[in-house]
């Protein structure tokens, strides 16, 4: 009877989530055979070194489980907002690693991401531990919530001489980092969490506070005409470029960067940087350099109320960037405690600008 109840609960949760999250990602990315990789820089060497150290910490069986062919598009697309009980991952589960292996994985994450990015992954996993505790506390089944249910995988062997990909994720988190020598693409990247208020390191922390503060400051800087262009609706909407939207392009909406004063442009850049700063310094700087160059063609749109804090959807759309912040009602109905957030460069998902066969 309990098995039937658990199965029914997972089906009901999957059905509810699907109304909020869209389809599973499908990737059609034929890989070129003549990819030229520029000489590696110190960041690339450091990342590959950390990846090699993690792989050396594994048994032969574990290495077999964590490594996939670089052209494996099924694995490339294997990320989701769903917990693992609804959307099974492949690779190695964090909870199955020993202390030494987890330390090596943490070191790898610390090279791929910034300190801010590492902190975000830890906060999101802490939120999932809290969600697991709240779900199991009522006696019902849990669809594999918790920090043990986050997975690591590689497409291709880490190398400074040929492209490869690193994946880490689970419920509400997907890091998809494609590397080719000194270049990297972090698109697509899913962040967010539930609950967003967590106790971490002895302090109560709101996971997305920095990016929400930046968005609110930008919105407050707009004059009435600019604000009329920015505000697109009075209720939060769902992700537009979430899982299942590989290859999708969207028309920009909202107030255009070229209509902003210089101080307002900087405030818009702050919105973008709050998310992009989760990348390591090299790749965050490269992304922001491109964003600054194109800020006049970058748009900001807002859907929802200004209060309460965190209850509105917003989107930044530029030639090479789309950022989304999407509050969710699923759970206890509090929009401010559950968010699905996306970063994409639709021109370079999974490094397709360099890798795709023409």
Regions found by a protein language model. Name each.
Residues 1-7:
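Bacterial N-terminal signal peptides that target proteins for export
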């Amino acid at each position: 009877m309990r098995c039937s109840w658990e199965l029914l609960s997972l089906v009901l949760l999957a059905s509810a989530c699907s109304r909020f999250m869209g389809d599973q990602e499908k990737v059609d990315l034929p890989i070129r055979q003549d990819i030229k990789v520029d000489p590696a820089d110190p960041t690339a060497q450091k990342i590959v070194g950390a990846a090699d150290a993690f792989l050396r910490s594994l048994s032969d069986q574990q290495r077999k489980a964590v490594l996939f062919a670089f052209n494996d598009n099924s694995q490339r697309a294997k990320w989701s907002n769903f917990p693992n009980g609804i959307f099974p991952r492949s690779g190695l589960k964090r909870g199955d690693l020993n202390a030494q292996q987890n330390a090596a994985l943490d070191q790898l994450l610390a090279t791929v991401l910034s300190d801010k990015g590492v902190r975000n992954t830890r906060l999101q996993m802490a939120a999932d531990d809290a969600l697991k505790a709240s779900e199991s506390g009522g006696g019902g089944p849990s669809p594999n919530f918790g920090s043990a249910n986050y997975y690591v995988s590689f497409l291709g062997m880490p190398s400074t001489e040929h492209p490869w990909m690193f994946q880490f994720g689970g419920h509400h988190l997907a890091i998809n980092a494609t590397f080719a020598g000194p270049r990297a693409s972090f698109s697509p990247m899913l962040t967010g969490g539930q609950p967003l208020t967590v106790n971490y390191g002895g302090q109560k922390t709101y996971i997305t506070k920095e990016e929400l503060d930046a968005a609110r400051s930008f919105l407050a800087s707009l004059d009435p005409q600019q604000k009329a262009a920015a505000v697109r609706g009075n209720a939060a909407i769902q992700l537009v470029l979430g899982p299942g939207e590989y290859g999708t392009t969207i028309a920009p909406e909202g107030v255009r960067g070229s209509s902003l004063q210089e101080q307002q442009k900087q405030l818009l850049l702050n919105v973008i940087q709050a998310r992009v700063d989760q990348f390591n310094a090299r790749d965050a700087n490269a992304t922001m350099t491109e964003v600054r160059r194109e800020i006049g063609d970058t748009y900001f749109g807002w859907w929802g109320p200004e209060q309460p804090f965190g209850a509105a959807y917003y989107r930044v759309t530029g030639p090479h960037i789309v950022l989304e912040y999407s509050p969710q009602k699923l759970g206890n109905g509090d929009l401010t405690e559950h968010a699905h957030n996306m970063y994409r460069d639709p021109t370079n998902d999974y490094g397709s600008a360099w890798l795709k066969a023409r």
